[in-house]
A protein has these predicted regions:
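Short alpha-helical donor nucleotide-sugar binding micro-motif in glycosyltransferases
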Residues: 274-279
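Short hydrophobic beta-strand element within catalytic cores of glycosyltransferases
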Residues: 281, 304-307, 317
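Glycosyltransferase donor-sugar binding loop
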Residues: 44-46, 176, 229-247, 261
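Aromatic "clamp/platform" in nucleotide-sugar-dependent glycosyltransferases that forms part
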Residues: 287
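Nucleotide-activated donor-binding/catalytic signature segment of Leloir-type glycosyltransferases, i.e.
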Residues: 243-266, 270
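N-terminal subdomain of nucleotide-sugar transferases
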Residues: 1-47, 372, 389-390
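Carbohydrate-associated surface elements
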Residues: 152, 175
Length: 390
């Protein structure tokens, strides 16, 4: 079985959960006894064992959605000879769709997010958002199977695309490598990042995008006790305007309280893991989140999580056992910020309870979210799709 994996992100150019997912899924698939043969195709220059596909020269100044389609055309041509194509995110869905039409091979999509649920992407793509939405819809309706990364995501897929046969939409959870993400206490690393390891702190890790809800967290921080810290590991802004909004809010917060640190970078794992481990609480204020792999990473590091109760997050954060959930209502941002502040304050004031939740979170990761099981389940979807074509 020869599988063509298509992804926009591939190490070292990984900036979001979808890229992390593809990296670990490919490694786990390759580790399976008698597993499939994989050809990885990524956007950009060739790297590692992936075939890179830079944006075609005539499209270098074009809208980002047109650049993606130009790259997808080249990838689709390179997929001749695959038995099945598996694409990740709308950026790559076009390549899978074209390969399916031109080469007659089945196409499997992993749903990491849905364009209609992310209208703010129009700020990044402009008119290209209409093309990204059309690409996703067309690819999903034509796909042989759709893999949702959570039960909540499956419900979302069927709600947004009701024409899809529910039997074609499968749940295969996202995962985390518990060896790569494990409790690592290193006050020196934390201090080297400008964070006081002796001050209890809440930690946010994520991209600067409307989806991640960072402005809500900054509003909540105004209500936190004065003796605790807030660390924001946030970069890769969708737009300059979003970055500036965060910069202004952080500067205002830093002027009013101590212990607010903004690390404007996506840290390497050897720095990120000690930073997560050292936090009393990890906070995920997302307003939209199909699963939230970052919450699994925090749990694997033994850190309690406070998160919004949206999308697939409640399937990852066991409320009251591995963390605390906060209801999100788009019409009540002040209430959401107050809820975040209250739950964060609970755990920051009770480090023993937070530590117990963190230990329970790691235990759950070890039992339910390993990559070997995810890879096995993915190959079962491949086999079922290929059998249906015979």
């Amino acid at each position: 079985m020869r599988i063509g994996i298509v992804t926009r992100e591939w190490p070292p150019a990984v900036y979001g959960g979808a890229g992390v997912h593809v990296e670990h899924l490919v490694a786990a698939l390759r580790s399976l006894p008698a597993g499939p043969e994989l050809d990885v195709h990524c956007f950009g220059d060739p790297r590692g064992d992936a075939t890179g596909h830079p944006v075609p020269e005539p499209l270098r100044e074009a809208n980002g959605a047109l650049q993606a389609w130009g790259t997808d055309v080249e990838i689709a041509a390179a997929l001749a000879g695959a038995d099945l194509v598996h694409s990740h995110t709308w950026y790559a869905n076009g390549a899978g769709l074209l390969a399916s039409l031109v080469h007659g091979v089945p196409h499997v999509i992993t749903a990491h997010s849905l364009e209609p649920r992310r209208p703010w992407k129009a700020e990044q793509l402009g008119g290209g958002y209409r093309l990204s939405s059309w690409t996703e819809r067309t690819a999903y309706l034509a796909a042989d199977a759709v893999i949702a990364v959570s039960g909540g995501m499956r419900d979302d897929v069927l709600a947004v695309y009701p024409e899809l046969d529910p039997a074609r939409v499968h749940v295969v959870y996202n995962g985390v490598d518990p060896d790569a993400y494990r409790p690592v206490q290193s006050p020196d690393v934390v201090r080297g990042l400008g964070v006081d390891p002796d001050r209890p702190y809440a930690l946010f890790v994520g991209r600067i995008t409307r989806q991640k809800g960072l402005p809500h967290l900054l509003a909540a921080a105004e209500q936190l006790p004065g003796d605790v810290g807030l660390v924001l590991c946030a970069g890769a802004a969708d737009t300059p305007a979003e970055r500036q909004q965060v910069a202004d809010a952080v500067a205002a917060l830093q002027a009013r309280r101590e212990g607010v640190v903004w690390i404007e970078a996506m840290l390497p794992r050897e720095q990120l893991v000690p930073l997560i481990t050292g936090a009393t609480v990890f906070v995920c204020p997302s307003v939209y989140e199909p699963l939230g792999i970052v919450n699994l990473e925090a749990a694997a590091c033994g850190t309690a999580v406070v998160a919004s109760a949206v999308g697939g997050i409640p399937e990852v954060v066991d409320d009251g056992r591995t963390g605390l959930l906060v209801p999100y209502d788009e019409a009540d941002p002040a209430g959401f910020a107050a809820g975040l502040a209250a739950r964060m304050s609970e755990l920051l004031a009770d480090p023993d309870r937070a530590a117990a939740m963190g230990a329970a979170g790691r235990e759950r990761v070890l039992s339910e979210f390993g990559w070997a099981a995810i890879a096995q389940r993915t190959t079962e979807v491949y086999s079922a799709v290929l059998a249906a074509r015979d």
